[in-house]
């Protein structure tokens, strides 16, 4: 059975390694090699909790196996991050966590959750598509970071973007 609960400070030591691994995974989508930094993961969680972001954790058999962070811009609910331990994937953990985000959105009268997604994150895109999330809502544009190596081009309609 999967248990979903609102995160408290006491869970930081057990969830921080997952946050650190999530950041490594995101960097890998950009071709950047990184290593988990649990102290940064703990700091990130503290920032979320201090800012009042709803953070949910998942447990199976009493052990933490995933987390989800929401940001609320009333009435919109954004999923900032969703991570499940690799050995627990495809077992309903992400779905159970995401249901909590959708319930939070419903509590504000909304029928959708907004998701920031890397364009080459096929795993989360497939997950969201299966849940009916198929509308490209917006594109985030920024200047390249100093030293950033942009290796791909992505076309949306007539526009070509570096990635």
Language-model segments: what does each one mean?
Residues 130, 134, 139-163:
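Terminal substrate-recognition subdomain of acyl/acetyltransferases
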Residues 84, 90-103, 126, 130:
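Conserved acetyl-CoA-binding loop-helix of GNAT-fold acetyltransferases
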Residues 57, 63-71, 78-83:
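Conserved beta-strand in the GNAT
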Residues 115-124, 146:
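Conserved beta-strand-loop-alpha-helix junction that forms the acyl-donor binding cleft
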């Amino acid at each position: 059975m999967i248990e979903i609960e609102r995160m408290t400070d006491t869970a930081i030591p057990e969830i921080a390694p997952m946050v650190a691994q999530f950041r490594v995974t995101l960097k890998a989508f950009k071709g950047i090699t990184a290593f988990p930094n649990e102290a940064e993961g703990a700091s990130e969680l503290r920032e979320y909790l201090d800012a009042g972001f709803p953070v949910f954790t998942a447990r199976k058999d009493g052990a933490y196996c995933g987390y989800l962070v929401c940001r609320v811009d009333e009435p919109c609910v954004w999923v900032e991050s969703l991570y499940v331990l690799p050995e627990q994937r495809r077992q309903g953990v992400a779905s159970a966590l995401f249901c909590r985000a959708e319930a939070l959105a419903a509590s504000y009268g909304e029928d959708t959750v907004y998701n920031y997604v890397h364009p080459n994150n096929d795993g989360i895109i497939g997950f969201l598509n299966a849940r009916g999330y198929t509308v490209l809502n917006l594109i985030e544009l920024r200047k390249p970071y100093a030293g950033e190596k942009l290796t791909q081009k992505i076309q949306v309609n007539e526009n070509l973007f570096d990635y």
